[in-house]
Amino acid sequence: MCFDKIKYLYVLVLLCFCSCGQSYIEEITTEYAQFKINDKGYICQIINRENGKNYLPEDKPSPVLQLYDGEKYILPTRLKSEGNKWTITFENNSEAVVSKEVKSDSYVRLSLQSLTNRDSIQAIAWGPYSTTISQYIGETVGVVRDTVFAIGVQALNIFTTEGVPHLGDDATGAFYINPLPGQTVPDELKDQVGKKISDINVNEEGDMPEYVRQWRGNAAVERPYGSDIQFEARDWRKEKVIDYVGRRQTVTAYDQDFIGSAIALFAVPSSEAVDVIGKIELQEGLPHPLIDGEWIKTRANQNPAYMLYEGSSLDNALNYADSCNFHLVHIGDIFKSWGHFDLHTSRFPNGVEEIKAFTDKAKARGIKIGVHTLTMFTSTHDAYVSPVPSDSLAISGSSILTKEITDTDRDIEIESPEFFTYLGETRSAKIGTEIIGYREVTKEKPYKLIDCTRGQFGTKPSNHKSGEKIDKLLNNCYSGFFPNLELSNVYGQRLAEVCNETGIGLMDFDGYYGGSPTGHGCMGASMFLKQWFDKLDEKNMISCGSSPFHYWWHIYSFMNWGEPWYDNLRQSQVNYRLENQRYFERNLMPGMLGWFKLEQTYRPEDIEWIQARSAAFDAGYLLRVDESVEKNGLKSQLFEAIRSWQELRNSHLLTNSQREKMKDPKNEFHLEKTGSNSWNLYELTLQSNNVHKYRQVQTGEPLLSKFVFDNPYDNQPVQFYGMIKDGGDKTGKISHLKILINGSATIEIPAELKEGNKIYSDGKNIYVCDNNWYTLLKYPCTSSALWSKGKNQVSVQCDFSSPNAPVVDLEFKALGNKEQIAGK
């Protein structure tokens, strides 16, 4: 494969010497652009008709089409134009007939009609089409743009996919060290700037470094001169074995090749790019879903804040949604198993009828219901697996038994270990109707599967004869399996049936890295989606997921990813969330922040941290809510903050300056609703880690701790939070807590406090609370307790019941720089 890459780069260098000269065999004109093609088969200029600017790099013409034979790219040498078609001759004397048509005065439709001398040709490549544009490179949508002009390509069928053939057929991406202005790279990595690094699993690592950039696809790629836009189509009609994600994978034959591959090429003002894609969808029969009569890409509030509820009280789900003013509720997994997708579960014992009744009830309250599936993951207890496994389960490859086995033998001899050395999570193989698990494969002949578990997942252990076929099953990361290409289509149809029957409004296709495990790349992933979408009775479904690719761009409403709530809120995948906003912006996608969980310990400042980021990026998010929120004494304030912030966000009244400040996760804000369409916005300062604990002091010396709080705002009543934390003595207590402000005003808390208690001041009163902010005691706060502008001296003292009594951890709070926001 390294050799292939070298060949490919060499070809790109050669293109620099294919001078276009001054004459063109064809000049194609659309409303906004002119495409100039020479008699060698190269696009030499893409001109913005408004200002005459050429967006192709000088001396770098782009081939209309290339051929790929598995080792090298075969370039065009001549192009002949006849009416609505081109005949392109290549270096190997192959001739391609490409139809061309300007449609809606907006784009050029190109389609491969035929190819001669094609026996050795494995794939064709559209382009790559080189541009000088580098500001926004849409690796998924296939559009590059700056603030003025956009150039893009859309694949017009599912077997035309993003990328270039020598890099495979997935929407491959990568991580690079490439700091943005103001970001610092560690000294030991400074020589790696601009270079690719190993993939980062943010769920395992917790986050990604801020100086790392992630690219999620290859429909468009960054180049020194700007960018390339690139698409391909492959001949799938012959079975082959490839190296795929660390394993050997048999790619089964499928009756599809590159004849008929088609693209739409366009160049328009940047502000028109999304609209042109909409025209292409309608003209070419691509998915064009509407929600409430509006196209998903331009509808208002296309990326809402919404809720996940996985509890059993579905009435609570609707009530919590009303409390947040959310109109979309994700209720999680509703399936008995993945595969057959049976709907009879403990939450919905009566299946379809019960789910439909609930979605109707929600709809009457203005709420859509969404559900979750891991796309093509197949449960081990599904009927496709147990008790008789389907022959349509995906396999990586096969061998044969070289020795007869009984139903109790635990070592199994096989002819070849080729497909069995990649163990995966379940290490499973299928012999006839029995699934066996194995611990390892011996490295020398006779090759054996060692320590086998017979009759895995409820299948029946059996005797097997020498010469019987043994298949290595493909495992997913949930220890289940995958369907083959044909069965995946059945899955797509079944999930459409579920949508049609139940009235759900959102389908969350989680785990789409399982979309094409069979090696059929984006085509296989797109086949599943097309089956689902085509079989929907109504196309007004919201769909989302975590791994978008080009075809899915047309269908999906927004990107969704989850479970990053295991860490402290303000450290929970923050860089990853921000990096995704850059991805959305360059790919004409609505912003989303991912998942959060409404914890029973949250304060208003915590939920407002989420809301400020949502408003900054105009990004939705998913908020997981369950009955634990009932334990939160500040619950009503949390819900009020969510409602107010989302109302402000959707009003689009924030200035660019305000939004830029909010994009910095280190900045805190408070929003105060003052009317039906008016708010006060405050900047907020929180200073934490002011810890007062027991220590030895000299006789007569007071046991106190001194802190300095720098208030950047005007004078104001003292506000703070305090957490009483473990000091080692679980039965220990503190009492007579006093907080002295600037040597004059004393705040006294006469209550006895223990580990888990919390205290706070809102400037008017002092509240003693349990661990979840439920008020136990309330005391008035002295009116003389004020934060002065600038540095404030704070002294804290109390009585400790023992040297290991609890400690007091204080967080000082101030707000200011009020800005009034009002709509009409």
Language-model features: locations:
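Autoprocessing Asn-cyclization modules and mimics
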Residues: 375-461
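Glycan-recognition surfaces
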Residues: 380, 384-398, 473-490, 533-633
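Bacterial Sec-dependent signal peptides at the C-terminal "C-region" and cleavage site
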Residues: 17-25
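Aromatic-lined carbohydrate-binding/catalytic grooves of carbohydrate-active enzymes
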Residues: 294-398, 474-497, 502-526
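Carbohydrate-binding surfaces of carbohydrate-active enzymes
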Residues: 355-371, 377-379, 392-399, 613, ...
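Glycine-rich, aromatic-flanked loop segments that form ligand/cofactor-binding clefts
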Residues: 269-289, 322-330, 354-397, 466, ...
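Carbohydrate-recognition beta-sandwich/jelly-roll modules
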Residues: 27-329, 361, 368-369, 505-506, ...
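Intrinsically disordered, low-complexity segments enriched in serine, threonine, and glycine
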Residues: 454-462, 466, 709-824
